Every structure is written in C-alpha cells, then in structure tokens.
C-alpha cells in the first residue's frame, strides 16, 4: 500500500505518494492544479497534475477518463507522456508527466523568437499533430500555453482534456478564442483535424509577429478580425454553414478582399508566408494537412520523412458516446489505472529478467 503525504498548494490539498517531494506550484487551470516535484525513485523532476473533483459529475468523470485514456495511448516525442498515475485516499486523481521548463506562451511574452527557433518549434508542432491526427484524435484546444518547451528547445503538446474523435459531425464551443478555427464559429457542427492546423497557423503567426494574430474581444469580433485579413469566406464555404442565425450574420457583413500576408509580415521569410497562407485557409477542405506542412520547403532544414511517425493504431473512442453514472466512470477509471501499473510492472520485470 502506497504511503501518502499531504501539502497545501494555493489553498488546495495535494495528497501524493511519498515517491514525490518538493512540490512547487507551476500553473492552475479550470480542471486542475499543476506542481513540479522531485521523483525520489528516478531522481528526475516531474509535473504532477491534480484533477479537481474528478467524480463530482458524470461530465467531469468522463472528461478525466478521456484524458487518461489519451495519455496512455499517445506515445510520441512531441506529445506529453505519462510517467505515473494514482488516486489519493481523498479520491482525487493525479497525473504525473515529464516536466518541461516553460511553455510557448511564456516564451512569446518574454522576447521575440529568432527564425531558426520559429522553424524548429513549428516543425515539432506539426510533427506532433501528424501523429495525433493519425491516431484519430483532434486536440481542439491548441494554443501557446498548451505547448511545452524545455531548455533544449524540445517541444511537447499537452492538455488533451478537450480532445475528441475525428468526426465530421463534431460539435461544441471549444478552443481559446484567438486560436479558434472559423469552421467552429461558422457551423458549430462539422469540423475535423483541420481545426488544429488553423490553431497551429495562428501560433506560427504569433511567433513571427510577437503578438496574437486574431485577438478577438468576443465571438463576433473574432470573426470580423479574421475577415479583415483573409477576406470574406468563399460562397461555397458560406453555404456549408448549418446555423441559420450564423448564416444571416455572415451574409450581413460587408464584403472584404483578402489581404496579402506579406504586407502584414514584412520581415518574414517568403517561404514562411507561403506556408502560413496554406494553414490559414477559410475552407478546411483546402487547408494544408499537418503531414503536408512537414514537407513544405520552409521546414526543409528539419524535415525527415523517416523520422515523422504516424500512430501504430487509432485511438479507441467506443466509450465517447456513453452516458454513464459517476460510479461507472469511477470503476472504469480504476481499471485503467490498474492496467497502467500492471503494464509498467510487467515491463520492469521483463527488463530485470534479461
């Protein structure tokens, strides 16, 4: 039986196993508090994320279960990896992952990025997205604060709490506004992996410019700012809008012409502009895919088709439409955690026997 110790962080009780010590707050989100800690077993520094009240409602239980399943499944150099998970005596859930020193949001607010760093960061974002998308997963909330970076400039995508299955009928109001793809605003119904490419394009533009590209004050203002730069959406895109109210709103806007991105990003490499234009396309069907972006000439210093793996198998989303009570989600969660530790123990036993 694991021994647990308690600590107070920002008025929140952290109840962790004695394997971890020296807790220091790193960040607070809507669904959890993250601390850095020392892993006394390995000697490395880790991030410990406490999921707040994971069993308070069926919706939160399902969200936590989904994030756990995704963290267990996704194994890629540019995606955050799970190193431990446990449930405390107070029935809080803790995810333990590798610790990276900072995130892209903090980097962007501290200083301008040099060209080679912009290239390398974008390459790693697209490399991670290629893998995630090939697993049948859409992140849905890609933004600078969800992109972690260490002192070696290694980059990892994190926070898959909003991630969803690839589904042409996907619904919902997700993603931080500045990085939200227009099809989420326009249709509220049909979107797919291309929303992540749009978000990556907004992040790319922010790295080039040093500030958010589309800093909308609200939903309507956000769309208006996008059209000021990219022009009015083509008719064939407008005709895909499912909501009559949204359709009337878009048709009521003044017609705008697309502005050349080169006129806004005057200091940027022409190849960077070319790739950005392919990422920020209104029509998701015409938007460049993550795998195609990797092969763009702008990223040629890093592109290696033999080292840009796709997922070996697609993620199993069979649970996603289930409407289950909290107790059932809790049992499923316990089962996943036991399975995780059994796999780890089996791997360790195999290593020791060799």
UniProtKB/Swiss-Prot annotation:
Cofactor list: Mg(2+)
Modified residues (Phosphotyrosine): 173
Top-level EC class: transferase
Organism: Botryotinia fuckeliana (strain B05.10) (Noble rot fungus)
Biological role stated in the UniProt entry: Proline-directed serine/threonine-protein kinase involved in a signal transduction pathway that is activated by changes in the osmolarity of the extracellular environment. Controls osmotic regulation of transcription of target genes. Involved in vegetative and pathogenic development like conidia formation, sclerotial development, and in penetration into unwounded plant tissue.
GO terms, molecular function: ATP binding; MAP kinase activity; protein serine kinase activity
InterPro entries: Kinase-like_dom_sf (IPR011009), MAP_kinase (IPR050117), MAP_kinase_CS (IPR003527), MAPK_p38-like (IPR008352), MAPK_Sty1/Hog1 (IPR038783), Prot_kinase_dom (IPR000719), Protein_kinase_ATP_BS (IPR017441), Ser/Thr_kinase_AS (IPR008271)
Modified residues (Phosphothreonine): 171
UniProt motif TXY: location: 171-173
Mod. after translation: Dually phosphorylated on Thr-171 and Tyr-173, which activates the enzyme. Phosphorylated under osmotic stress, specific fungicides, and oxidative stress mediated by H(2)O(2) and menadione.
Residues in Protein kinase domain copies: 20-299
Active site annotation, chain numbering: 141 (proton acceptor)
Gene that produces this protein: hog1
Superkingdom, natural source: Eukaryota
A single GO BP: stress-activated MAPK cascade
Principal location: cytoplasm
Domain note: The TXY motif contains the threonine and tyrosine residues whose phosphorylation activates the MAP kinases.
Binding site for ATP: 26-34, 49
The name this protein goes by in its record: Mitogen-activated protein kinase hog1
Family: Belongs to the protein kinase superfamily. Ser/Thr protein kinase family. MAP kinase subfamily. HOG1 sub-subfamily.
EC number(s) reported in the record: 2.7.11.24
């Amino acid at each position: 039986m694991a021994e647990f110790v308690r600590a107070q962080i920002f008025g929140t009780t952290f109840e962790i196993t004695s394997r971890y010590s020296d807790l220091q707050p790193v960040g607070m989100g809507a669904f959890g508090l993250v601390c850095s800690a020392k892993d006394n077993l390995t000697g490395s520094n880790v991030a410990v994320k406490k999921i707040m009240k994971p069993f308070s409602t069926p919706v939160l239980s399902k969200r936590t279960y989904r994030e756990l399943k995704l963290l267990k499944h996704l194994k890629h150099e540019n995606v955050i990896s799970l190193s431990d998970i446990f449930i405390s005596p107070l029935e809080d859930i803790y995810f333990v992952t590798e610790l990276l020193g900072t995130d892209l949001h903090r980097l962007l607010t501290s200083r301008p990025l040099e060209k080679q760093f912009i290239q390398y960061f974008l390459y790693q974002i697209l490399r991670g997205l290629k893998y995630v998308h090939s697993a049948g997963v859409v992140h849905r909330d890609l933004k600078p604060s969800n992109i972690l970076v260490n002192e070696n400039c290694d980059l990892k995508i994190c926070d898959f709490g909003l991630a969803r299955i690839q589904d042409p009928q996907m619904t919902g109001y997700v993603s931080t506004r500045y990085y939200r793809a227009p099809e989420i605003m326009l249709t509220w119904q049909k979107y797919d992996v291309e929303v992540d490419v749009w978000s990556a394009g907004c992040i790319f533009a922010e790295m080039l410019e040093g500030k958010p590209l589309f800093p909308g004050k609200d939903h309507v203002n956000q769309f208006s700012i996008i059209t000021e730069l990219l022009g009015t959406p083509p008719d064939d895109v407008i005709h895909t809008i499912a909501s009559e109210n949204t359709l009337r709103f878009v048709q009521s806007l003044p017609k705008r012409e697309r502005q050349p991105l080169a006129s806004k990003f005057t200091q940027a490499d022409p190849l960077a502009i070319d790739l950005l234009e392919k990422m920020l396309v209104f029509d998701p069907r015409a938007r460049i895919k993550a795998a195609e972006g990797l092969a763009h000439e702008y990223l040629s210093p890093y592109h290696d088709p033999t080292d840009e793996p796709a997922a070996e198998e697609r993620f199993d989303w069979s649970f996603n439409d289930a409407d289950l009570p909290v107790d059932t989600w809790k049992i499923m969660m316990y089962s996943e955690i036991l399975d995780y530790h059994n796999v780890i123990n089996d791997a360790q036993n195999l290593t020791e026997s060799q």
